[in-house]
Amino acid sequence: MNERAIASVEVDARGRLLVRPESENASLYEYIYREANGLRWDRERHAICAHDASRWQHGDLLTHIVITVRDALGENLKVTAATAWVGVSPELERELLEVLSQGQPS
């Protein structure tokens, strides 16, 4: 299983959670929609997001993204010291870090 740094976690103006993996090969994520579980690749933002963001709490969506990338693409997404938090409140950042620190979701 490959480790993949998360370049940024963003909450945009519409409240969507976007997770941008640190990757030179965006085509790896382009077809994540084929998993048919509500995720898609935002080509403009180079990030994974929910097709219908209103269905998800941010913590649940992050868990879903991590599990899908792990199971479908064989990559473990990890926050690093270089991960940018864009439009994310300190409270939400703590919540999302807690979600990720609980180990690999099953």
Segments (PLM) and residue ranges:
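Accessory DNA-engaging acidic/polar modules
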Residues: 1-106
